[in-house]
């Protein structure tokens, strides 16, 4: 990097910070923080624990955005000041230090952009994730299990908890279906960009001729919705089927029709749960999944109306990412256009840069 390139980078980052400042409105956020702190001084504040909890979460999010904003803003304007001084004094050592720090400077502004993209109404919620293999039998089912492991490892890296709602193993390998909740701050905000079709290209370990296969698996992500959010679900719109749970679980599981499948006929959304031996608990978990999926569906429909997208384009039916393992190694996201060669690390849950790249591209 030379002085011209670094100067252009500073112009870009300075303009970006100006735009972000207009959106973030740091003075208004600081004012809101002061209001919350004043509210928390009131002895009656904690009488309504649910409301107090929400306001405390808002405070934490606001503090995080402000801290990230000030860190990025200070770093950019300090760099501009040092750059001008070093140029004037022909201080080559300081200039080299600034050039070396350019990547860190970009990462700070990127972190701020990501924080902004995680400020949606339900971005801080837990995420309900469902993975369904496409046609292709064992190969697709194995691909579904690879994606399942990827998300579990991602959750583990972040210290998030995972609760399995429904797990149906494949006959030979992999999984036929899995639904689970990832519990942690901004789990939905990050994983909402995973909605869609994931494509795998590799030499199949299940093909004795060692031919290359292409497999598809759909991933659906919706926010875990609080009980106080009203989602209207009419009984007449539901078809509820019970069946025997598959897979391990002992004799009791196989004798009792404890597994539940609920179909919401107006939208065609299907959810199922067989995680518990209690049919009542499985039905409760399935209804929670349905509520979240319907909420996500309605939000997507509203956004589509704003964007002028055809109704047929709404949903989870679009290919969003390709994972190529042979003849070369590459993961490419169709929305951000970013390509990565560290396929093994990504499949081991190292997906933050992937997710953040999509979040930032959607902000533009």
Curated annotation (Swiss-Prot):
Family matches, as InterPro entries: PCRF, Pep_chain_release_fac_I, Pep_chain_release_fac_I_sf, PrfB
UniProt PTM: Methylated by PrmC. Methylation increases the termination efficiency of RF2.
Protein name: Peptide chain release factor 2
NCBIfam families documented for this protein: prfB
HAMAP family cross-referenced by the UniProt entry: Rel_fac_2
Modification sites for N5-methylglutamine: 251
Disulfide bonds: none
UniProt GO molecular function: translation release factor activity, codon specific
Family recorded in the similarity comment: Belongs to the prokaryotic/mitochondrial release factor family.
Role of this protein: Peptide chain release factor 2 directs the termination of translation in response to the peptide chain termination codons UGA and UAA.
Pfam families tied to this protein: PCRF, RF-1
SMART domains linked to this entry: PCRF (SM00937)
Primary location recorded for the protein, binned into one broad class: cytoplasm
UniProt entry tagged with the keyword Zinc: no
Subcellular location: Cytoplasm
Gene Ontology CC: one annotated term: cytoplasm
Keyword Transcription regulation annotated: no
Gene3D superfamilies: 3.30.160.20, 3.30.70.1660, Release factor (1.20.58.410)
Keywords on record: Cytoplasm, Methylation, Protein biosynthesis
């Amino acid at each position: 990097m030379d002085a011209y390139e670094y100067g252009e980078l500073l112009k870009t980052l300075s303009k970006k910070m100006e735009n972000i400042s207009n959106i973030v409105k740091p003075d208004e956020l600081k004012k809101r923080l002061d209001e919350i702190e004043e509210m928390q001084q009131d002895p009656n504040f904690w009488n309504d624990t649910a409301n107090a909890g929400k306001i405390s979460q808002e405070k934490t999010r606001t503090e995080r955005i402000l801290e990230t904003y000030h860190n990025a803003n200070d770093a950019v304007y300090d760099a501009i000041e040092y750059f001008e001084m070093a140029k004037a004094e022909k201080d080559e050592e300081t200039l080299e230090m600034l050039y070396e720090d350019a990547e860190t400077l970009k990462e700070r502004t990127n972190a701020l952009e990501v924080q902004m993209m995680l400020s949606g109404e339900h971005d801080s919620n837990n995420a309900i994730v469902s993975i369904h293999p496409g046609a292709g039998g064992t190969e697709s089912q194995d691909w579904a299990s690879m994606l399942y492991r990827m998300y579990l490892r991602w959750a583990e890296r972040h210290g998030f908890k995972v609760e399995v709602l429904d797990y149906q193993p494949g006959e030979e390998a992999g999984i036929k279906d899995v639904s689970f909740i990832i519990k942690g701050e901004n789990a939905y905000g990050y994983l909402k960009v995973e909605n869609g079709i994931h494509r795998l290209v590799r030499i199949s370990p299940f093909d004795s001729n060692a031919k290359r296969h292409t497999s598809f698996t759909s991933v659906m992500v919706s926010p875990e919705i609080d009980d106080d959010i009203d989602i209207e679900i009419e009984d007449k719109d539901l078809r509820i089927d019970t069946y025997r749970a598959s897979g391990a679980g002992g004799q009791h599981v196989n004798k009792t029709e404890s597994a539940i499948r609920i179909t919401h006929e107006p939208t065609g959304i299907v959810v199922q749960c067989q995680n518990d031996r209690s049919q009542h608990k499985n039905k409760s978990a399935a209804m929670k999944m349905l509520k979240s999926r319907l909420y996500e569906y309605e939000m997507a429909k509203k956004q589509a109306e704003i964007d002028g997208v055809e109704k047929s384009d709404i949903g989870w039916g679009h290919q969003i990412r390709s994972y190529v393992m042979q003849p070369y190694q590459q993961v490419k996201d169709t929305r951000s256009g970013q390509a990565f060669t560290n396929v093994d690390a990504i499949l081991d849950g190292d997906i933050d840069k992937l997710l953040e790249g999509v979040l930032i591209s959607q902000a533009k």
